[in-house]
From Swiss-Prot:
InterPro entries: Anaphtx_C3AR1, Anphylx_rcpt_C3a/C5a1-2, Formyl_rcpt-rel, GPCR_Rhodpsn, GPCR_Rhodpsn_7TM. One of its GO terms (cellular component) is plasma membrane. It is a multi-pass membrane protein. Interacts with VGF-derived peptide TLQP-21. Disulfide bonds join 95-172. This is C3a anaphylatoxin chemotactic receptor. Residues 47-57, 119-139, 358-374, 436-481 are cytoplasmic. Receptor for the chemotactic and inflammatory peptide anaphylatoxin C3a. This receptor stimulates chemotaxis, granule enzyme release and superoxide anion production. Keywords: Cell membrane, Chemotaxis, Disulfide bond, G-protein coupled receptor, Glycoprotein, Membrane, Phosphoprotein, Receptor, Sulfation, Transducer, Transmembrane, Transmembrane helix. One of its GO terms (molecular function) is G protein-coupled receptor activity. The lineage of its organism: Eukaryota, Metazoa, Chordata, Craniata, Vertebrata. It is found in: Cell membrane. The modification Sulfotyrosine is found at residues 174, 184, 315. Belongs to the G-protein coupled receptor 1 family.
């Protein structure tokens, strides 16, 4: 996920090209979301929580508004993160907290929308059961369970988010192992740091750091070279970032010439014509596209050798080999978000509203039911439009080489997808609340009471009048939205 998802998505601004147009578009979306979503959600939260009678519907939307309001409050940090080109000046705790809040909002919103959908379906198909069992207490209990599950789903974000320092700038990103994910710039620095030599370079017959030529057998490929590099995820550098003389700057040059380790001796009886005394000291031998450790003896069966395919790819292409292996926690996080946070709720919503439409076409329902259905369908549609690009790009990023055109496109527009997902928190109050006739009436009345209290010379009288008006109309409030 771009900055916080990532969501979502494992890439951060640190590893993404700074494409000005998508970033500006993302900042515009986030700014509008904050400017519209903060007062909109605040108004809904105040009116639904304090001015309207507590019903099952108001409980659903009250909790949904709370989740959206938390997301809106975190948007200024996202804007600053984009404006600073990925730098994170807020410290380690906020690096963990703010992305967690965004993910918490994501799961809480989708779970609440799913609960609202199931609730509407039960009202249509089981009206008698709902009359006996559908109450505010049950709705509050379900909302509490939803918050607990959403909190559990955001724990991996809080655990794996860490601060990285690159070029004296702090970055907020995922860290899935104790040693951290090294960037190719760090790889140039010291590839053997905190690594034991025997785990990097070994020869057959080498026991306890001693080379025993007598252990070689003539028919056992005596000079087979094996390597065992620790699993580490590196990013392929661009062509411009590599030195022109990549051979002289090869990060493997020190691996094959470790200080203090004697070069292996050629067993007696082996042909040595044209052979260098210390083949491991000859960097050209390892930079050859054919990887001939012993050029003069390449055709001799006694000098057969084997090197890992990644070394062959590296030296034949003259660049690092891109490791397509993705971290297991990242795959688990992305797939869980896709299935639990998008696919399963989407299937439930589409199925329930399809059944409701069919049922309403067969029976006679009040106009209020039709209005509720239209508002709910719009809310679900907007949710799918906002969140589908985020989840799709997250899954594609797991299986796409970032050097391909598709990979570059995903990285460039990842910020836009994340901003669009956050915009869902702005649309909800205008869709499900402000479109409702009863809510518009109560909102106008509440705003009017605020203005009267602010400008009236008789504050007590104005407040008393508005309070009486609120009390007199409570009995006429409908439970539909």
């Amino acid at each position: 996920m771009a900055p916080f998802s990532a969501e979502t998505n494992s890439t951060d601004l640190l590893s993404q090209p700074w494409n000005e147009s998508p970033v500006i578009l993302s900042m515009v979306i986030l700014s509008l979301t904050f400017l519209l979503g903060l007062p909109g959600n605040g108004l809904v939260l105040w009116v639904a929580g304090l001015k309207m009678q507590r019903t099952v519907n108001t409980v659903w939307f009250l909790h949904l508004t709370l989740a959206d309001l938390l997301c809106c409050l975190s948007l200024p940090f996202s804007l600053a993160h984009l404006a600073l080109q990925g730098q994170w000046p807020y410290g380690r705790f906020l690096c963990k907290l703010i992305p967690s809040i965004i993910v918490l909002n994501m799961f809480a919103s989708v779970f609440l929308l799913t609960a609202i959908t199931l609730d509407r379906c039960l009202v249509v198909f089981k009206p008698i059961w709902c009359q006996n069992h559908r109450n505010v207490g049950t709705a509050c209990t379900i909302c509490g369970c939803i918050w607990v599950v959403a909190f559990v789903m955001c724990i991996p974000v809080f655990v794996y988010r860490e601060i990285f320092t690159t070029d004296n700038h702090s970055k907020c990103g995922y860290k899935f192992d104790l040693s951290g994910s090294l960037d190719y710039l760090d790889f140039y620095g010291n590839p053997l740091e905190n690594r034991s030599l025997e785990n990097i370079f070994q020869l057959p017959g080498e026991m306890n750091d001693r080379l025993d030529p007598s252990s070689f057998q003539a028919n056992d490929h005596p000079w087979t070279v094996t390597t065992a590099f620790h699993t580490q995820t590196f990013q392929r550098p661009s062509a411009d970032s590599l030195p022109k003389d990549s051979a002289s700057h090869s990060p493997y040059s020190n691996v094959f010439k470790p200080a203090g380790v004697a070069s292996p001796k050629i067993p007696s009886g082996f042909p040595i014509e044209g052979h260098k005394t210390s083949p491991l000291d000859d960097s050209d031998a390892f930079l050859s596209t054919h990887l001939k450790l012993f050029p003069s003896a390449a055709s001799n069966s006694l000098y057969e050798y084997e090197l890992p395919q990644d070394f062959q790819d590296y030296y034949s292409l003259g660049q690092f080999t891109y490791d397509n292996q993705v971290s297991t926690p990242l795959v688990a996080i992305t797939i869980t978000r896709l299935v639990v946070g998008f696919l399963l709720p989407s299937v439930i919503m589409i199925a329930c509203y399809s059944f409701i439409v069919l049922r309403m076409q067969r029976g006679r329902f009040a106009k209020s039911q039709g209005k509720t259905l239209r508002v709910a369908v719009v809310v679900v549609t907007v949710f799918l439009v906002c969140w589908a690009p985020y989840h799709i790009s997250g899954v594609l990023s797991l299986f796409t080489d970032p050097e391909t055109p598709l990979g570059k496109t995903l990285m460039s527009w990842d910020h836009v997808f994340t901003a669009l997902a956050s915009a869902n928190s702005c649309f909800n109050p205008f869709l499900y609340a402000l479109l409702g006739k009863d809510f518009r009436k109560k909102a106008r009345q509440s705003i009017q009471s605020i203005l009267e209290a602010a400008f009236s010379e008789e504050l007590t009288h104005s407040t008393h009048c508005s309070s009486n008006n609120v009390f007199s109309e409570r009995n006429s409030i409908s439970t539909t939205v």
